[in-house]
Amino acid sequence: MAIKSFNDKDTEALWEGRKTKKSWPINQIGERALRKLNVLDAATKLNDLRLTPGNRFESLEGTDEYSIRINQRWRICFAWEPADQAAIDSGSIDLAEAPGSALNVYIDDYH
């Protein structure tokens, strides 16, 4: 599926190729962040993000969010909306294998 929404105007601006005034160092992480956003946009299920070890895909403790790493300091955080919630609820498919979309995407300082 695709990225459906952003939680941060600056992350959305980066995705759309617009200038941003965000405090994160766009000149240092911008190109790599955009590559990772493309990876997220191309993912059809959460397990797709596990295929590349460099993503360092993880579930964020205490939230319904996930992240992939841009580098040691920065990560892209997002929620996952399965296309068929009823299949998840019935147990016929695991969330990690369920087709879906990324929601509320934003770049966060890990430290």
What residues fall within each predicted segment?
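Sequence-level motif detector for i,i+2 pairs with an aromatic at +2
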Residues: 1, 35, 52-55, 63, ...
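Enriched for short, Lys/Arg-rich terminal
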Residues: 61, 66-111
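A short, surface-exposed loop/turn module that caps and links secondary-structure elements
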Residues: 44-67
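Amphipathic alpha-helical interface surfaces
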Residues: 7, 33-36, 56, 70, ...
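Conserved phosphate-interacting/catalytic interface
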Residues: 40
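Generic structural signal for well-ordered secondary structure
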Residues: 4, 30-33, 49-53, 71
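Arg/Lys-rich, positively charged N-terminal/basic patches that mediate binding to nucleic acids
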Residues: 1-36
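Basic, Lys/Arg-rich DNA-contacting stretches centered on the C-terminal catalytic core
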Residues: 18, 22, 58-60, 110
